[in-house]
Curated annotation (Swiss-Prot):
It is found in: Cell inner membrane. It is a peripheral membrane protein. Keywords: Cell inner membrane, Cell membrane, Membrane, Multifunctional enzyme, NAD, Quinone, Translocase, Transport, Ubiquinone. This is NADH-quinone oxidoreductase subunit C/D. NDH-1 is composed of 13 different subunits. Subunits NuoB, CD, E, F, and G constitute the peripheral sector of the complex. Its EC number is 7.1.1.-. It comes from Escherichia coli O1:K1 / APEC. Residues 1-190 are annotated as: NADH dehydrogenase I subunit C. Pfam families: Complex1_30kDa (PF00329), Complex1_49kDa (PF00346). Signal peptide: none annotated. It comes from the Bacteria. In the N-terminal section; belongs to the complex I 30 kDa subunit family.
Amino acid sequence: MVNNMTDLTAQEPAWQTRDHLDDPVIGELRNRFGPDAFTVQATRTGVPVVWIKREQLLEVGDFLKKLPKPYVMLFDLHGMDERLRTHREGLPAADFSVFYHLISIDRNRDIMLKVALAENDLHVPTFTKLFPNANWYERETWDLFGITFDGHPNLRRIMMPQTWKGHPLRKDYPARATEFSPFELTKAKQDLEMEALTFKPEEWGMKRGTENEDFMFLNLGPNHPSAHGAFRIVLQLDGEEIVDCVPDIGYHHRGAEKMGERQSWHSYIPYTDRIEYLGGCVNEMPYVLAVEKLAGITVPDRVNVIRVMLSELFRINSHLLYISTFIQDVGAMTPVFFAFTDRQKIYDLVEAITGFRMHPAWFRIGGVAHDLPRGWDRLLREFLDWMPKRLASYEKAALQNTILKGRSQGVAAYGAKEALEWGTTGAGLRATGIDFDVRKARPYSGYENFDFEIPVGGGVSDCYTRVMLKVEELRQSLRILEQCLNNMPEGPFKADHPLTTPPPKERTLQHIETLITHFLQVSWGPVMPANESFQMVEATKGINSYYLTSDGSTMSYRTRIRTPSYAHLQQIPAAIRGSLVSDLIVYLGSIDFVMSDVDR
């Protein structure tokens, strides 16, 4: 690690509002479709944002996918209710909009396409013909906004129950329980809900049998221990062979994006911890960075290193649970108990620094909650001396076991093409040989100042390769923590900026104006300038991102959370068809997901 850490204030701020007209893809689009074919929106997302006509969508998408350095991954797709948005200067008229976020690995660049829709014509052609992973994203957008995707293979609810009325992310849909009538579960309603959960194969394009045999349909979950949460997979079986399967999600849906519209920018931080409840501060990182882009805040170097340190501690904590439970899914119990001993040491350190364990809610807009306590370095030193030997013992005792290898090598295998088509990120993508880790490819919070490697597989992502990459990632996180320990900068733990929240208490004592300013910022929350911002991070399970829209208020107009687990579960049928039920159990253990991350 560089001892004289980079002065980030001397660099071009990441929060500048830009239209990205200098991005090569804008020129390529204009050359193909004409200079007046679309509207370019200036934002603080860090990517070109281009409004196109609905009729151009598939043609533009196909063009981007076939460029010499193509946009090969549909990273995200969702909608927005634009009807109450007041700051829309220069944008096409729209009651609703749909956005498509595409990534080019070769260019290491993104582009966001937007389509404007009128309330009386909420139709847009399905994107599944170009990107198969658009399936779930379009279902969710229809479920929560009521936007119809013409030609979609099975446009039905995915987050809400099939019997639900209305579309919750619309602005005219209530955001608080007190706005609803008291909930009553009558016998008739209970029977209706149970009937709605009955799986009908024909609705999913499945056959109940052939001339010579009948298929068996088996519910795995939503209460099966190997489902790793409230998650159901309906299996179509020929003997023990999986002919097809349908993942059924939404049981853990809490309306996290809707909550973002009624919490202040500051008070939403605790909710971010619970999106992926094992990641802790890792989940706070993309949110606070996106808010800081809106606010125009550049944090001190000490804040960057503290944030990296906490993120890597939680990465190790999550990986330890993942590795040990994977081994347990295959059939060995002992490593789980050893791993919880190691995780307790991390929790002791996290608790000493933040005051909390799993959900610290410790990052702040402009910094962290408080400075590092005395003795933090001793606790970290003890952990760094302890963990490498333990990791070696796991690898020797369990991960090199011939039975475990036989159960996991070659199981649920896919290549780079399939990974990109399904929006796979994290170890699942890197196992295919694609070297893409956001900490290296698009450094944030000072990761460019750290010396560490990105483990990459040999071309095929199977269960065993994914697990072994996580083991090596754990070692690299230990390297990063060592550098944090040896090179922690001096300086403040918060930025000196008017929108840093909470503001310094001592400024309230100057005169009545500063007291009122402090009172409003703490009670109502800071007012963020009207704009859009975006931040992705390499989270514990893949790429996690927040796409925030501010309308110049104390609360977010739209909070879009893209989680890696959502994309990874959608890929299950494509990766497991033709395998056995026992292989599915191993595959689920190798994905590394929690349902709170999927359902939000």
